[in-house]
């Protein structure tokens, strides 16, 4: 699975932090909505197209916060 994009709501701390990830594996697209940082709770969404996944990302990023896109690390070899 390859991570394509990562957004963060600009808040620090386990309670306030939220992240949204866009990933792809083959023809399947995945969106992860995570609350609480690395050890937080995640909800996963699976889609057959990038556009459908991005629709969900846009809806999630409409929630309150100073959302910003974070750079994605290149895949390790």
What are these model-predicted stretches?
Residues 71-77:
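Short, highly charged C-terminal tails/helix-capping segments
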Residues 59-71:
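Short arginine-rich
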Residues 1-30, 77:
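Short N-terminal "domain-start" leader segments
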Residues 35-52:
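A short, exposed loop/beta-hairpin motif centered on an aromatic-Gly-Thr core
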Residues 50-60:
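Short, surface-exposed linear segments at secondary-structure transitions and domain or protein termini
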Residues 17, 30, 44-48, 64-67:
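Intrinsically disordered, low-complexity regulatory regions of eukaryotic regulatory proteins
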Residues 2, 18-20, 35-37, 56-58:
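Alpha-helical interaction segments
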Residues 23-25, 34, 48, 73:
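A structural detector for beta-sheet-dominated domains
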């Amino acid at each position: 699975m390859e991570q394509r994009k990562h957004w963060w709501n600009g808040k620090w701390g386990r309670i306030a932090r939220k992240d949204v990830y866009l990933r792809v594996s083959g023809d399947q697209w995945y969106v992860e909505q995570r609350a609480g940082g690395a050890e937080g709770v995640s909800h996963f969404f699976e889609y057959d197209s990038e556009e459908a996944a991005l629709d969900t990302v846009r809806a999630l990023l409409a929630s309150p916060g100073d959302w910003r896109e974070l750079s994605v690390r290149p895949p390790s070899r």
